[in-house]
Every structure is written in structure tokens, then in C-alpha cells.
């Protein structure tokens, strides 16, 4: 891949760039004019050592518009991690529920905790953005993914254990209340997040959200294959121009 300075091609890339903030989302659905724009938050894959796998993330998202109508979109995408903690993730467009066609890949992500680099690659423009990746790989999942009960009014409930895709998971249901007036509501509304977390893999295999703000979403990790993926899966594609957006190293004054 050819590496160039970030500013040198910034303006030429602006028309096709996907902001890094959207890297956590497959896509976004706008509400009716005058409403808010909900955001879909997917699962987070940590750089866990010695826990290699390949899997598919399936998402179904229902968003209610200001006029009371709702729309449902979906997609699926490939994720993988090797024993060194390197992570590969696809991002795909969302398509209306019922559409049988495979959606287009919008972004490819390559996270390397050893080199402390992360690439966001865009197939439509054959361009990759290179950023610092400050997260270091670790050997033990330090959390089951749950938030702290009582913080900001959050109520957390232990749902016990369940085997999903052959892996033991810990279930948690979290409920927060949306204050009156937040979205035109005259009384408090519950937002519920239920997830089943695999300590072996270090992330949620199931994530269900019921939220008046962002809509209802169902995320499932399926087709989990334990073991080392093909090493080529963690290499950014050949022939892409790389925009180096890393921060310059700090220099000490003498």
C-alpha cells in the first residue's frame, strides 16, 4: 500500500470518507424532519490474547419515526481475531428487512495491539486511514460487560448463565429511565439493555436493546469458529492508498 500524508489528500477524500465515530455503527437511519437521529451501537471486540476466532455478527434494527411509523433494517458482517489479539471487522450497509441480497461492504477495520495501529479501509475509494491504536492486548477478560448498578440511576439484574453457540455466557439486564421531556414524553420511559457475555471470547454474543431514543435492536454473534483464522485476514488490502492520520510523536525540549 502507498502511504501519503493525511492533509495531502484530505480534501479529495472528504466526499467519500466515513467518520471514525461511525466505525461502531453499520449505518444510520434518520428520523423524520425535526427529529433526532438514532445511533446503533454494536458489540465491541477487545484485543484478547490466545482467544482466536472467526464469526458472523447479525443485526436487526427497528427505528420508530416521529409520525409513529417504524422501519426495520438488517445486515450481517464478518469479525475475527488471532492469538496475538489482532482484530478484523467488516462494516456493511443496512438493508430493509426481507431483502435477500447481500449488502455492500462500506468499511474494513484492522486493529493491531502489537504495532498500536488501526486501519479504516474504504473499498469504494480504495483508501485506508491509519490511526494510532493505544489499546494493548491482555490475557484475561476483566469484566463481564456489565455497567455499575446505581450509576446514573441504572438498575442491573443478573440473569445467570446460558450456553450460546457452545460457549458459556453470563446474562445481564440493565434498565435506565429516560426523564420526562427528553423526547417529548410526559412521563419517564424505560430503556432496557440485555446482553449475554462470553468470558472466553471477551465480548457479548447476544445484545438486545429496547430504547425509545435509538429504537429496538437485536444483535447476535453466530457461526463462531474457534481457532486461528487465516493470517491474511488481518492485512489491509493491497492497492489501497494509505492516509497516515497518526498523531506525531511528542518531542521533549532541551
Give residue spans per PLM region:
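Extended soluble regions of mature proteins
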Residues: 25-254
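Bacterial N-terminal signal peptides
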Residues: 8-17
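Boundary at the C-terminal end of the N-terminal hydrophobic targeting segment
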Residues: 19-25
Amino acid at each position: 500500500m502507498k502511504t501519503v500524508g493525511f492533509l495531502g489528500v484530505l480534501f479529495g477524500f472528504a466526499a467519500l470518507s466515513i467518520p471514525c465515530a461511525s466505525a461502531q455503527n453499520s449505518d444510520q437511519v434518520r428520523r423524520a424532519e425535526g427529529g433526532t437521529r438514532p445511533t446503533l451501537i454494536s458489540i465491541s471486540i477487545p484485543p484478547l490474547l490466545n482467544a482466536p476466532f472467526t464469526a458472523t455478527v447479525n443485526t436487526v434494527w427497528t427505528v420508530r419515526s416521529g409520525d409513529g411509523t417504524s422501519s426495520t433494517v438488517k445486515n450481517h458482517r464478518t469479525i475475527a481475531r488471532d492469538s496475538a489479539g489482532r482484530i478484523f471487522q467488516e462494516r456493511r450497509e443496512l438493508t430493509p428487512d426481507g431483502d435477500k441480497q447481500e449488502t455492500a461492504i462500506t468499511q474494513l477495520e484492522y486493529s493491531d495491539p502489537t504495532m498500536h495501529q488501526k486501519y479504516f479501509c474504504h473499498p469504494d475509494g480504495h483508501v485506508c486511514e491509519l490511526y494510532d491504536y493505544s489499546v494493548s492486548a491482555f490475557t484475561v477478560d476483566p469484566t463481564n460487560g456489565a455497567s455499575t448498578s446505581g450509576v446514573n440511576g441504572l438498575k442491573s439484574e443478573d440473569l445467570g448463565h446460558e450456553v450460546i453457540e457452545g460457549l458459556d455466557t453470563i446474562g445481564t439486564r440493565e434498565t435506565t429511565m429516560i426523564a420526562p421531556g427528553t423526547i417529548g414524553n410526559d412521563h419517564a420511559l424505560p430503556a432496557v439493555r440485555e446482553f449475554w457475555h462470553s468470558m472466553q471470547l471477551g465480548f457479548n454474543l447476544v445484545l438486545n436493546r429496547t430504547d425509545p431514543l435509538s429504537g429496538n435492536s437485536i444483535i447476535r454473534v453466530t457461526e463462531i469458529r474457534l481457532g486461528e483464522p487465516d493470517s491474511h485476514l488481518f492485512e489491509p488490502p493491497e492497492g489501497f492508498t494509505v492516509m497516515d492520520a497518526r498523531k506525531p510523536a511528542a518531542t521533549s525540549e532541551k
